[in-house]
Amino acid sequence: MNEKNRISVVINTYNAEQHLDRVLTAVKDFDEILICDMESTDHTVEIARRHHCRIVTFERKQYNIVEPAREYAIHEASNEWVLVVDADEVVTPALRDYLYTLIQQEHCPDGLFIPRKNYFMGRFMRCHYPDHILRFFRKDKTHWPAIIHCVPEVAGRVEKIPAKRKELAFEHLANDTIENIVYKTNQYTRNELERKQHKHYGTMAFFWRPFFRFFKTYILKGAILDGRPGFIKAVLEGYYQFIFLAKKYEQSI
């Protein structure tokens, strides 16, 4: 295969043993699998070694977000093309074949948004599909800012896989428990407070922001079609907004 038609899979990990074996099995036919581990204390590194991955370590230090490690990892990759995969995401054979076909085209894009199927309480959540994420790109044209949930910046043409191509979507296995979601809500709202420390919200925001997030998820995005898990998910979306606003108020008194 032409050197320019090789793909490195980059996976950032921190105590990611739960799904890692399945995730790595799914990407075994790519040219390189690079694990960028953030000082895991479980069996993550052991699993990666068993799959013959190349492993680099990113010291967590003061970081409590993954984005700085993503920037480091993509530029540690050996190949021009990089596919970033989370440690709870499965790449389908159809997606792999699609990517290799794409990069052989003369006028292929420099970056690609890929749809993702999210699961909650064991159920595919239609309300969160297609959840496009920019995860495939030329590494030399890409910079990943050190901002939580930030989209990588690609200097070039970026395209998007159509939502109807569900066979090309990542399978997102997170399937978080309520306990994990509450834990992440605490983490994410803490980070959001840092980013919005100079922003102010009125009293009515305590009502309309949680309600609108619930309404948007349950009605506009269609969680109502996802049964009881859809209702619970919509409530949790509103809960996130309420916790953020409550913490914001707490800071001001």
Residue ranges and their predicted role:
Residues Q18-D21, D42-H51, A94-L95:
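Acidic helix N-cap motif at the loop->helix transition within catalytic regions
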Residues R6-S8, E32:
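Cell-envelope/extracellular polymer assembly enzymes that use nucleotide-activated donors
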Residues V82:
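Short aromatic/hydrophobic "clamp" motif used to bind/position activated sugar donors
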Residues V45-S78:
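Conserved donor nucleotide-binding strand/loop of the catalytic core
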Residues A26, D37-E46:
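A conserved acidic beta->alpha catalytic loop
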Residues F30-S40, V56-F58, A87:
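Short beta-strand/loop segment that forms part of the nucleotide-sugar
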Residues V10-D29:
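Short, well-formed alpha-helical segments that are part of the catalytic scaffolds
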Residues E67-I74, V85, T92-Q251:
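Catalytic-site signature of metal-activated, phosphate-bearing donor transferases
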